[in-house]
Regions:
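S-adenosyl-L-methionine
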Residues: 2-113, 153-179
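Conserved SAM-binding loop of SAM-dependent methyltransferases across substrates and taxa
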Residues: 127-137
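A short SAM/SAH-binding and catalytic strip from SAM-dependent methyltransferases
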Residues: 182-198
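Conserved SAM-binding motif I beta-strand of class I
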Residues: 138-143
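Conserved class I S-adenosyl-L-methionine
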Residues: 114-124
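Short alpha-helix immediately C-terminal to the canonical SAM-binding loop
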Residues: 149-150
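C-terminal substrate-binding/active-site "lid" region of AdoMet-derived donor-dependent transferases
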Residues: 197-264
Length: 275
């Protein structure tokens, strides 16, 4: 079921991107309703639309039939948030989010893998943590930028979904305070843009908490395009870190993101656990 949903999401994304004639800075789509192509829990789908509707980065929406699927197109602008996000010295990547549907799929996979807590590192507007929350995770959203955390607070209040936004430097935060048992960490940074340094720091912190790594998963956002990565493309550019820190790859899924909207390849997300 999940594999076909992912393929259908990629199909409508590519069809939409090929025919999009608008001028919005960012744009993404969410199916209007559950269907055979998108067998999503109706309550969850309603919450995904609520996230977009209550999120100030989106200024317009309209319905469109894409590859035979009724969808809502959301158009937005993240320029101000992007500019604000790059002012922090330890920030590993400017705010450039994955798609809401992609965030849901990733959280769904993590749930199937047995994790109960979701920690979104460099969380932007909190969409992965939000999706974790509606799927029953205890979510924590770690973001260094105060403006983005303010945006998350607004979304929490408007959607009645508290995914625990925290304005803090992920490199300095004491994760033992969260009393994690079976967490999955999502690393918000590509390897060639400082994400490798962020990930290495988070792994060190996981290792510093007694017995935590036994039940911990880490998800990395990778790339399939040589122009973005001059080194090893295997595992989305994360192979060296995966080998160095003795991680096993347990799943890889490629999904639409804001930054691959104009590309024929999607963003690979690599699910790993400690050996």
């Amino acid at each position: 079921m999940l594999d076909s949903l992912v393929q259908n999401l990629i199909k409508i994304k590519q069809d939409f991107a090929k025919n999009y004639s608008g001028s919005a800075h960012i744009q993404e789509i969410i199916p209007s309703q559950a269907s055979d192509s998108f067998p999503i829990d109706k309550t969850h789908l309603k919450q995904l639309h609520a996230f977009a509707e209550k999120n100030p980065i989106y200024f317009n929406s309209f319905e469109e039939i894409i590859s035979g699927v009724s969808c809502i197109v959301y158009e937005g602008d993240i320029n101000d948030y992007w500019l604000n996000s790059i002012k922090h010295g330890s920030s590993c990547q400017p705010f450039y989010p994955t798609w809401i549907m992609s965030a849901y799929v990733m959280a769904f996979i993590a749930k199937k893998l047995g994790y109960s807590e979701l920690v979104d590192i460099g969380s932007g507007d909190g969409r992965i943590a939000f999706c974790g929350n509606i799927l029953g995770f205890t979510s924590y959203s770690i973001e260094i930028d105060d403006v983005l955390v303010g945006l998350q607070d607004t979304i929490c209040a408007q959607t009645n979904q508290n995914f625990n936004p925290r304005c803090t430097d992920a490199l300095e935060f004491d994760y033992s305070k969260l009393n994690l048992k079976t967490p999955v960490f999502f690393i918000g940074g590509l390897p060639q843009m400082g994400g490798d340094l962020l990930a290495a720091s988070i792994i060190e912190k996981i290792n510093s908490i007694v017995n935590l790594k036994i039940n911990t998963g880490i998800v990395f956002a990778g790339t399939n395009t040589q122009r973005q990565l001059s080194g090893n493309l295997s595992n989305g550019g994360w192979s060296n870190l995966i080998e160095e820190h003795h991680l096993d790859v347990i799943d890889t899924v490629s999904l639409p993101t804001i930054w691959t909207f104009d590309q024929l390849v999607e963003t690979p997300y690599i699910f790993t656990k400690f050996k």
